[in-house]
UniProtKB/Swiss-Prot annotation:
Subunit structure: Interacts with HscA and stimulates its ATPase activity. Interacts with IscU.
Name the UniProt record assigns to this protein: Co-chaperone protein HscB
Lineage: Bacteria, Pseudomonadati, Pseudomonadota, Gammaproteobacteria, Enterobacterales
NCBIfam families registered for this protein in UniProt: hscB (TIGR00714), PRK05014.1 (NF003449)
PROSITE patterns attached to this UniProt entry: DNAJ_2
Family: Belongs to the HscB family.
GO terms classed as biological process: [2Fe-2S] cluster assembly; protein complex oligomerization; protein folding
């Protein structure tokens, strides 16, 4: 059973996050291993396994990029383990330049420039994210998979920039 079905939700990117949360709580109560403490060993094991599946489904569906990757996996794109990389050389060059800029900001310990950099990367991420949503809604799976690969780069860059921000603020 796929994670969307487990949660009683349609298999699409845009979800009702409140319904997702409520269903998670219901499933957790229903399959909590403590409820099966007096059951047979097989029942206890099944409850632990079901609870683990519910937790994994929850983590996957509530995180936007993980949810997109999972939805794509249902359509034959295994982005989590694939060896495909982004082949868009202009995008890759831009990423290299952004990484170099982040390194320069770190060397200079320039908080103002870092703040501007983070905003710029967030805007780039948001723009691509919106494109991905449209591609998933339109079921253009190849294009959506390519956009998700690019979003991974931007997500890692944003994370690195935010870590640098924490590091600079700790000084």
């Amino acid at each position: 059973m796929d994670y969307f079905t487990l949660f009683g939700l349609p298999a699409r990117y845009q979800l009702d996050t409140q319904a997702l949360s409520l269903r998670f709580q219901d499933l957790q109560r229903q399959y909590h291993p403590d409820k099966f403490a007096s059951g047979s060993q097989a029942e206890q094991l099944a409850a632990v396994q079901q609870s683990a599946t519910i937790n994994q489904a929850w983590q996957t569906l509530r995180h936007p990029l993980m949810r997109a990757e999972y939805l794509l996996s249902l359509h034959g794109f295994d982005l989590a383990s694939e060896q495909h990389t982004v082949r868009d050389t202009a995008f890759l060059m831009e990423q290299l330049e952004l990484r170099e800029e982040l390194d320069e900001i770190e060397q200079a310990k320039d908080e103002a420039r870092l703040e501007s950099f983070i905003k710029r990367v967030k805007k780039m991420f948001d723009t691509r994210h919106q494109l991905m949503v449209e591609q998933l809604d339109n079921e253009t799976w190849d294009a959506a998979a390519d956009t998700v690969r690019k979003l991974r780069f931007l997500d890692k860059l944003r994370s690195s920039a935010e870590q640098l921000e924490e590091k600079l603020l700790d000084f």
